[in-house]
């Protein structure tokens, strides 16, 4: 299978796309064509998560032999998750289930792809017989950073540098990054938001700095979901959801199910859409936004407009206005690299673009959008705990609030089972979780965690609890205009080590 840029005719192999991350023209890599539907439940029901991952991903990385892919998924998913099923799907009622994606090393859904991605990248690097070092440059709105740092920690031949908004993540998320272990990692806060960090990194990928670094022996790549090595492993868990629902008799063999995804950078919900294209019987696919509702407005109007106030919310991983993976969705909807290139240029120049009526009819046939206010989010957290004895993090609560409102309005078929994607452990956000339980947060987030645990009986995950006594190793904060300089300094450090 070949991969091409969303903006031009640039074409590469899957292994080349893995290492490069971003196309030379600034576009994102997509398959030259998506695989035809190939999923048959009867053939898949007996598979473990790692076996299912190998089967599904072999259709997207067909330049990796089957036995090699099985070994990679086995190494990635063995002993790295707290539950044997990797992604437990918990039935809450006849109407809906929760797909828990927070049982990995950093308590967030990013662990599912970032446990495997380092293995894929190292494999691709070996196959290309390229002796250069790889520097992973990553922007994070909270969860990707820690998951990427943990995934690439001490991986030979690979280094990772993460940029996060210094005032835009939760205290626990910040501790996870600032207290990261490893001899090949670097963490830097920025004065700005996630869009600033991601936008600057995209410019770096198209700059002379990338060329200079390559001449020094350091290649740039990305661990954000702009990289196919992040995106396609996420497809697997939507297939897993389907099989889990069948095993639990939540749906019948010929029934569909709806999926609600709390959405920031659009990678997670795009993976759900791709899963549907290859045969997962997803009915309604719902994109849930928080107060930064640029996507919800797009689905309503057909216009993507970032000329608006940016809100710092209690669901920081969704505090994004420029959703990078939306570019891929536009490509699939329009089928035109010229249209995508023009829209992305308009977004850069004016902060706004609109789709044609024909394209929007296709979009609305594939996906719906909704949003939840901070009040609706917190009420959802309280109500679900009171009714179902289930504690949600704020991102999952946004998804539930959108689902609940759409269900009341009749926008979701009442007879169709719905899966809400639970993207992070609630204990990563102790302040808002405590408030939703009627508790007053303590000044120290770890004291707040203990208070929540005492009330709910839910143990503090080891991965979070052990942070309290660990020293902070990364406290640098730079202006977004200084990010390129910080990257070049780290490149020089890497070269000095070698």
Question: Residues of each region from the PLM?
Answer:
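PLP-dependent amino-acid enzyme catalytic core
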Residues: 1-498
